Amino acid sequence: MSAPTTPAAALDDVEEGVVLRPKFDAAGLVTCVTTDAQSGDVLMVAFMNDEALKKTIDSGEAWYFSRSRGRLWRKGESSGHVQRVLEIRVDCDQDAVWIKVEQGGGAACHTGRKSCFYRRVDRDAEGAPLLSPVDAERLFDPAKVYR
């Protein structure tokens, strides 16, 4: 199954229609929110280009586009922590994607943590923003996995 990605469509068709018509930004990317299918926890936020979205739909595994590396990558290609996609959704105007996954290896973050969202914004005694670890246990050692 290949995803049609027609760029232009009537607003009603985009918001209420049944045809996948992702609205990619000027760089050809769409934001992807990835959550754990069982717990609902946010694991990561990444980007997909047209090819990454098609590969994700066709393979049932999460593919993303790395802005820093300028290339497509399959989640888990280095770590072995592959994301098996159970559901894909788009938002109302199809400019964001939400995928629900089973996270292989238990960790989605390259830092070795379950989620990339392992710090909460709190305030110090003077009221300045301060980052506090939350659910920050490392499930693997990145130095050993990404050699």
UniProtKB/Swiss-Prot annotation:
Keyword set includes Nuclease: no
Annotated family: Belongs to the PRA-CH family.
Organism name: Rhodopseudomonas palustris (strain BisB18)
Binding sites annotated in the UniProt record for Mg(2+): D91, D93, D95
Record's protein name: Phosphoribosyl-AMP cyclohydrolase
Cofactor(s) the protein needs: Mg(2+); Zn(2+)
Primary location group: cytoplasm
PANTHER family for the chain: HISTIDINE BIOSYNTHESIS BIFUNCTIONAL PROTEIN, HISTIDINE BIOSYNTHESIS BIFUNCTIONAL PROTEIN HIS7
Its biological purpose: Catalyzes the hydrolysis of the adenine ring of phosphoribosyl-AMP.
Source lineage: Bacteria, Pseudomonadati, Pseudomonadota, Alphaproteobacteria, Hyphomicrobiales
GO BP term, example: L-histidine biosynthetic process
InterPro entries per UniProt: PRA-CH, PRib_AMP_CycHydrolase_dom, PRib_AMP_CycHydrolase_sf
Subunit organization: Homodimer.
Pathway as given in its UniProt record: Amino-acid biosynthesis; L-histidine biosynthesis; L-histidine from 5-phospho-alpha-D-ribose 1-diphosphate: step 3/9
HAMAP family: HisI (MF_01021)
Protein location: Cytoplasm
Residues the record lists as binding Zn(2+): C92, C109, C116
One MF term in the entry's GO annotations: zinc ion binding
